[in-house]
């Protein structure tokens, strides 16, 4: 197995390299009859594409998606959907000086160890450019979810860049689309702007924390032990380039709480059981509770920087490496739409799994 595919029923295979002629995704398992609109998929891709502001790489890629198969008269046929995005702004010459050197923090050395050769142009398959294909596939998942679970909403935003976190008391979700950071706190967005400008001038980069929230998720998605919804979400987020940690709900902070603080109490409401808090992040025992599913992931600083770094060459010589080219000072910014796409793919996959196993049946609560 080459491990380029994820999912159980809704399966996504991505292909292509950063400086190849194209990249894309093959989406298998999409239910038939779903309205598939290339313009809607393009909307999600436009949110991720590079070169939109000074805080992301200046590589100018239109990321125009083409649907090559799997649809007829605007609807899915149930057969594999092939999505292709052409690369149009490669500058492979920027990488000529490091063809024989391993860039610190990159997958250069591990790819070389494993395969005996590597595409040094922008990292090849290990480049974050690959995530464009995931966002396109996520557009298919969103289209299916919008028909199968109309009230489900997925929203991603940045909660921290470097040491600077948002003030959650000031969260205004209307602000998320109004700044280049997907930041729900306008005061923090202004702080991040100045902070990143300073890092860019210093030829450095920084990490970030992204939060993805899904509301309207039906209760009952996921399965015990080895089919947990949260384990699949964590695995999906960990596959995103530069992600080094994932947490669900309170996550690591739950270690600082007592049992009486952390356990979400339950009461009967007008429409059934209601949780009084959501420390669990919408998942208990691997199964969704019907509350918001909340996932956060930490993104490491961009490893490609203009500051000289010590490394070695393929023949063992010690050198200093300066990575030229066009790179994000904070790759976490463009990871927001990628995290949303992965959330959509996993939720649709588990919705289809649940319908196949239980038919959507639910145990009654509060009925005489």
UniProtKB/Swiss-Prot annotation:
Name used for this protein in its record: Chorismate synthase
CDD domains, sorted: Chorismate_synthase
GO cellular component assignments: cytosol
Encoding gene, per UniProt annotation: aroC
Enzyme Commission designation: 4.2.3.5
InterPro entries, sorted: Chorismate_synth, Chorismate_synth_AroC_sf, Chorismate_synthase_CS
Keyword ATP-binding tagged: no
Known cofactor(s): FMNH2
PANTHER family in the record: CHORISMATE SYNTHASE
Annotated binding of NADP(+), by residue: 48, 54
One BP term from GO: aromatic amino acid family biosynthetic process
Catalytic activity: 5-O-(1-carboxyvinyl)-3-phosphoshikimate = chorismate + phosphate
Assigned protein family: Belongs to the chorismate synthase family.
Functional note: This reaction introduces a second double bond into the aromatic ring system.
Pathway(s): Metabolic intermediate biosynthesis; chorismate biosynthesis; chorismate from D-erythrose 4-phosphate and phosphoenolpyruvate: step 7/7
Cofactor note as given: Reduced FMN (FMNH(2)).
Assembly: Homotetramer.
Top-rank EC class of the record's enzyme: lyase
Signal sequence bounds: none
Binding site for FMN: 125-127, 241-242, 285, 300-304, 326
């Amino acid at each position: 197995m080459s491990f380029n595919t994820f999912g159980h029923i809704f399966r996504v295979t991505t292909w292509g390299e950063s400086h190849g002629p194209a990249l894309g995704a093959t989406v298998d398992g999409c239910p038939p009859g779903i309205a598939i609109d290339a313009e809607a998929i393009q909307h999600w891709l436009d949110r991720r594409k590079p070169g939109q502001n000074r805080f992301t790489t200046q590589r100018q890629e239109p990321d125009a998606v083409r649907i090559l198969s799997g649809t007829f008269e605007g609807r899915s046929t149930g057969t594999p959907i092939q999505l292709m995005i052409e690369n149009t702004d490669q500058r492979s010459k920027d990488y000529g000086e490091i063809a024989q050197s391993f860039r610190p923090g990159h997958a250069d050395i591990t790819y070389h160890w494993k395969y005996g050769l590597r595409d040094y142009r922008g990292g090849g398959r290990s480049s974050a450019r690959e995530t464009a294909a995931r966002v396109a596939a996520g557009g298919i998942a969103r289209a299916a979810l919008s028909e199968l679970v109309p009230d489900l909403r997925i929203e991603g935003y940045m909660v921290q860049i470097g040491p600077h976190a948002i003030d959650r008391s000031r969260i205004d979700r209307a602000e998320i689309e109004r700044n280049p950071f997907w930041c729900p706190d306008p005061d923090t967005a202004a702080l991040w702007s100045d902070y990143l400008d300073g890092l860019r001038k210093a030829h450095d980069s920084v990490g970030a924390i992204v939060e993805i929230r899904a509301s309207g998720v039906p209760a009952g998605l996921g399965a015990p032990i080895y089919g947990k919804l949260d384990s699949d979400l964590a695995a999906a987020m960990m596959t995103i380039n530069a992600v080094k940690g994932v947490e669900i709900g309170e996550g690591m902070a739950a270690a600082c709480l007592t049992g009486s603080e952390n356990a979400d109490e339950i009461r009967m409401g007008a429409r059934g059981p209601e949780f009084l808090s959501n420390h669990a992040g919408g998942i208990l025992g691997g199964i969704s509770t019907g509350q918001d599913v909340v996932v956060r992931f930490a993104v490491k600083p961009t490893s490609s920087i203009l500051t000289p770094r010590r490394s070695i060459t393929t023949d063992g010589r010690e050198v200093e490496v300066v990575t030229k080219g066009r790179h994000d000072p904070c790759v976490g910014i463009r990871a927001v739409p990628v995290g949303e796409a992965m959330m959509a793919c996993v939720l649709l996959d588990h919705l289809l799994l649940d319908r196949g196993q239980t038919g959507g049946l639910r145990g009654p609560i509060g009925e005489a």
